[in-house]
Every structure is written in structure tokens, then in C-alpha cells.
Amino acid sequence: MITGEALTNTLVDELNDLGLPNMAATLDSLYRSERFLKLDHLSLIAELIEPEYQDKVSKRVNNRLRHAKLIGCPQSLDDCVDSQSREYLPAGITSVLSSLAFVLDGLNICILGPSDSGKTHLAKAIGVAACKEYKVEYHHCESFLEDMVALKNVSYEKYERKLKLLERLDLLILDDFLLHTITDEREVKILFMILEKRCEAQKSTIVCSQREPKSWASMILNDEVSANAITKRATKHYTVVINAQNNQ
């Protein structure tokens, strides 16, 4: 007759073969503890599943962070509060954004403030938090548009595939938005197309800029219509202003 220890060892081996090492280790540890016989069936199942589940969740979040180019970022929304060095306006806006309801609702966020005011910190903190539930990408706007133009020139098929992925992406973050003047008509068209498609699909986009939206049109040369359309979509919902006290 097979003993409890022999059966446990067999189950541990089978769980490892199934690619469930955390569950296997937990079963082995529980069986050798005094608590094993005191656990009811559901409690035992719960204790076996929890470590494996948490490991899978952690790996999924890390994969999302890596894809978003946010892996290893220390930024946290807990740090994005009013202080002596900076103020977030309107009042209470960081608490609203921390809920991430805007991602679910497909709303856009425009983060404004001078250089080193904390725009990137806030955007990355939102991105890191969003990766727990959503697919995110973080890009510097200028290099992002250059890469999209280059991809289109190399392979239109891959470019189209990337556009479709961007259209379905839960949250797109474009940092340093219009930091320099866009003179390439192809970049203007791509930026407009992405914002337009994402608005139609009700997907959230965050842009961070040192410049007031009223000056954006002058940063997009030779296409006033597209410039106005881009501004309208990027500032459609929430606008966050960061006042950095040390910059005033």
C-alpha cells in the first residue's frame, strides 16, 4: 500500500513536471509541517494554489513592464503628492489618476510642467501601476515617431502590424511631447493617425509636455489642420499641471 509520504513525493514530481514548482514546493513543505492534518480540504487547496498564482501574476506584470520599457523603474504613485517642492493641479488629481479608472474609460491625460518638474516621474508611476492590469507602452515622442517612419520605410507590413497593436494598446505614454519642432510631414501624419485611432477605439494616451497646448500648433509646421486635431485629441479629457516650487 502506498504511503502518504510516497504519494506526496509522487505528487511533487508530477507538479514539477507540469511546470508548477511553487505548488510542488508548498505541498512538500505543508506535508512535513504540523499544520497539514489540521487543514480542511479547501484551505489546503488555497495554500497550494496561492504561491503559484502569485508567481504567475508577478511574471505577467514583469513581462508587461518589460514590454512597456518600464522594467526596473522605481517610480511610484505614492510619491506623487503635493509637497514643498511641487504641486499637482487640479487639487486631488493624482488620487483620481491612481484609481486607473481613466484607462478603463479610455480617457486621455495631458501632463504639463517645466523641465524637471516631475512629469516623467508621474507618467512612469502611472505606467508602472497600470502594468498590473493593462498593456502599456512608454516612449519618448520624438524617437518614437522617427522609429515609426523608419519601420514604414523598411516594411510596410510590419508598420501596419505595429499600428494595429498601438490601436489596441490599453495605455500609450508619449513623453517629451513636441519637445522639438516636427518638420517631417510623415511624422505628423503618423502622430495624428495614432491619436485618432486610439480615440476611436477609446484607448487612453498620456502625453507629457513642457509647452502649453496653445503653442503646439507652431511646433507642427506646414499642417495647421493636423496640428489642431492633434492638440484637440491629446487634451480631450484630463490636463494635469505640475508646479515645481524650485523652478518658480
At which residue positions do the language-model features occur?
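Charged, compositionally biased N-terminal leader segments and the immediate start
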Residues: M1-L18, A24
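Walker A/P-loop nucleotide-binding motif
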Residues: D105-L122
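Interdomain "pre-motor" coupling segment immediately N-terminal to P-loop NTPase/helicase cores
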Residues: L20-G72
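Short glycine-rich substrate-engagement loop in P-loop NTPases that contacts/grips substrate
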Residues: R86-T94, C131, E137-E167
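N-terminal pre-Walker A segment at the start of P-loop NTPase domains
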Residues: P74-L100
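Conserved alpha-helical scaffold flanking the Walker A/P-loop in AAA+ ATPase domains
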Residues: S95-A101, A150-L172, K189-K197, A229-I230
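P-loop NTPase Walker A phosphate-binding motif
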Residues: H121-K132
